[in-house]
Amino acid sequence: MATSVEADTKSQVNLKVANDGGESASETGVVDVYDDPLIHNSIRKKLDLKLLPLLSAMYLFNAIDRSNLGNAKTDGLEKDLHMKGNEYSITLVLFYVTFCLLDVPANMLLKKFSGKIMLPTLMMGWGSMTLIQCAVHNWGGLIACRLLMGAFEAGFMAGVVYYLTTFYRRNELALRISIFYGAATIAGAFSGLLAYGVFQINHPSIPGWKFLMIIEGSATILLASFAYWHLPSSVLSCKWFTEEEKHVAEQRMLHDGSIQTDEKFALKTALANLLDWKIALYAVIGISYGVASASVGNFLPQMVQRLGFGTVKTNLYTVAPYCVGCVILLAQCTSSDHFRERSTHLAGAMLLTFVGFILLITLDTEAQPGPTYFACFLLAAGAFTPSCIFHSWHNNNTPSENGRAAVTGFMVGASNSGGIISSLAFASKTAPKYIPALIVTATFQGVGIVLVLGFGAWFRWDNRRRDRVQGVRIRTGDVATVSVDDASWRWTA
């Protein structure tokens, strides 16, 4: 009969550990993890107060700068740049081309040169492109800026997710990613309020959307300059930790995060992880929820505008759904970390958005404005959570740092590619209801829900199989981080 294994099994679990010099942590290979909760709490507190806020602020501007075309469109962007037909949708598609293709290369560079260097560099690049957009006078100039912006923004989300996996344990990751990613929901609310204020400016020759680009681009560049100085490259070089905390922080990661910390960059090893069959299924799931996330991020103002509001009120009425989305995001990710469970939480979040799109498809906007606006709340409530739980999920099941760098870059690229599908689906000829686009998005979301639940069931089945082989019942957090081929490894389902 299977027996339960206590969570603290550090003295029973053999773990292959290597430091920078390649020496094992001890003769027996047993990791000595400090049990003093005060030290662990101090480490988490310092990371939560000194690392997370800056990363969240950086991603706030990442999301604002990426999605500000939605606000600019409501202020006459297309008219000022003499855009016709589907040129707005094409602009969004071209952004996603560079945004998706360069995720893996950017994350490989981050692994090689560290997040301390690469994350601020990427931010400086896209901030410059945002600022330059205020000087464009035609569609061609806008495309050039958006292509370059996509190139610089590529790898930032993946880079931060990977970067966080080198500081936080597996059961701490989803909540921290949600706090960081919650900036995207705040960005939606903040950009709506900012656009509301900026569009009140009446200048004889400069339209309001250009002032928006100037303000957002300048703020991005200033924050990137500060990040160069503030960000640490690893737990061992973190200036906020005492020597004892540095040692414990490293042991925390070895026990429940990575096979090896500060692992030397190895391109062949990193890319080899992409050949696993599970990566293809993860990628399809990423694309599925990515379509919905991009649709909400890029077109929520247009969906709200269906209610008949003018430019100012449309941007103002997008604030509340984003705020609700932020609260739901934090609640679901806290629950996901607490229960060490990903698939059911992920499917539940996707279901909210699925129902929201179904309502928008079936409701008569003019006759039922209240339910239509409620559907927008459902969209925001479920559009942002999937990214946090999904990227926590595949990182939890990839113990190698090199592997996580490659897989995270690939998965972020896959999920971002949903933006291409979304941008093509929201053709201007189907405005203002965009029914075909809503149907496409709901279909992808429905397929994704089925795949997530099936994948989670497979992980649970394989964990039970491993329990039977070993004759013990082991939970994911009961054992130190080992190779997935090790008999004691357990998947996060």
Curated annotation (Swiss-Prot):
Bilayer topology annotation: Multi-pass membrane protein
Question: Record's Gene Ontology CC terms?
Answer: membrane
Under InterPro entries, the record lists: MFS, MFS_dom, MFS_trans_sf
Residue ranges that the Swiss-Prot or TrEMBL entry lists as coiled coil: none
The set of disulfide-linked cysteines is none
User: Which positions, given as ranges, span the membrane?
Assistant: 90-110, 117-137, 147-167, 179-199, 211-231, 279-299, 316-336, 343-363, 370-390, 406-426, 435-455
**Subcellular location field:** Membrane
* Keywords of this entry: Membrane, Transmembrane, Transmembrane helix, Transport
Record has Signal as a keyword: no
Which Pfam families does its entry note? MFS_1
Q: Which domain of life is it from?
A: Eukaryota
- PROSITE patterns on file: MFS
Per its record, what are the GO molecular function terms? transmembrane transporter activity
Transport as UniProt keyword: yes
* Role description: MFS-type transporter; part of the gene cluster that mediates the biosynthesis of enfumafungin, a glycosylated fernene-type triterpenoid with potent antifungal activity, mediated by its interaction with beta-1,3-glucan synthase and the fungal cell wall. Might facilitate the transport of glucose units to the subcellular site of enfumafungin biosynthesis.
- Of which family is this protein a member? Belongs to the major facilitator superfamily.
Its protein name is: MFS-type transporter efuF
Source organism: Hormonema carpetanum
